[in-house]
Amino acid sequence: MRLCLTACILAAFASTAALAQPSDPRLKNSYTFQKDGWTYIHLEGTPSEIGFQHGYLLATQIADNLQTIELENTHEAGKPWPYFRAIAHNQIMPRIEPEYRAELQGIADGVQAAGQNIDILDIVALNAHLEVSDYYIPWLLKQQGKTSPAALVAPGRCSAFIATGAATKDGKIVIAHSNWSAYMEGERWTTVFDIVPAKGNHILMDGSPGLIHSGDDFGVNSAGIMITETTLPMFQGWNPSGIPEFIRARKAMQYANNIDQFVALMREGNNGGYANSWLVGDRKTNEIAYLELGLKHTPLSRKTTGYFVSANFPVNPDLIRDDTPGFDTHDMKSTMNARHVRAEEFVQQHLGQLDTALAEQYLSDHYDSYDHKVVAARRSLCGHEDVSKDPEPAWDSPPFSPSGAVTGKVMDASMAEHMSFTARAGHPCGEDFLAAPFLAAHPEFNWQAHVLHDMKAGPWSTFTISQHKTL
């Protein structure tokens, strides 16, 4: 698969897969369907079986997603796709444990069985793209005494909170997250994965075609562990002998039975890639935690009552100094600090009443705490960078960048007990993004034209494990 994907492949992406599948025994118990802008997929079996099901059932979506990530990475890094495949082979694959290597190979086998020219190096590069492009490559170029392209910088694009005890309406955990990304990426980040692995916990998480981890990291497992994160902006550092972040994130989602285990799995072999502030809750104990997973510092805070908000701002002074040295805590014009202020305001305003309905409002909020007015732009919790005339220097985002909040997800402890969450594809506020008028007004982004589509918001929809389209 390369940038020359045909129009028929892209057209096939829009079709709804039937529940009845071919007779290949590896596809047993797997299925997929479309609902309200989301692709739901149920995967079940051994690692290689889960991978094959994923690759076969989502083959056209994986090809489309890979085309988009290839375009984005090669444009920003100024390197051809074989460069990223080489990194996947030399830096990433040797540090992938057998269980997940088998699943990744299974995805490649599945997409090939469905007729796509995609191999395991493409799949590994796709899974690792978040940590390779903005973390590994800048570190590598620095080691070589070279200057990194300005676009390759750890971003800060998500809004989230987790609350429990006296902070919530029923005294139990509520969690919320919006994925911020480039619209060409985010419009494809609309898959609900229902995974029943041979080992570990049952998983329900959102994600992107071809990824074995969530990527924007919102999900719940059958042990009652509720998980999300937002990225640490302007992060610097890499441990070349560490375990890829996407492996640690998937393993923690699958195997963590409590907060301590989640933290240990994320810290073990930390390579510094895709560094995040993790918000974690344990439905069984009603405890929540906030893990700032830097490379040199990984501070952890825990609460049985209260809340944590997160919008890409580091908190720990040592981490700010050593892991995110370019972050300015006093620049209130930046999206990270402005959203930090608004997140605190919103939660304090509704303290003691937080539930999933208010969580949806939080993710949809358009108040700009810097300009003190309601305006959907880069400083609102529901981000709309495409209408912002100002750049975001922290991650070299240009004026009118086609990026922002692309999905919203909410869940409470009762939903987690039944392994369910509510999600909206598109802007959490419900506004649509239309590609043609945007590109006409901003032709500097025409390099994205063949992959940038309309991103129309769907309704808030609830998804549950073992769900079928009729539910």
Predicted segment positions?
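Bacterial N-terminal signal peptides
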Residues: 4-15
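N-terminal mature-domain region immediately after signal-peptide cleavage
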Residues: 19-260, 267-272, 279-302, 335-471
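Extended amphipathic alpha-helical segments with heptad-repeat/coiled-coil character used for oligomerization
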Residues: 287-330
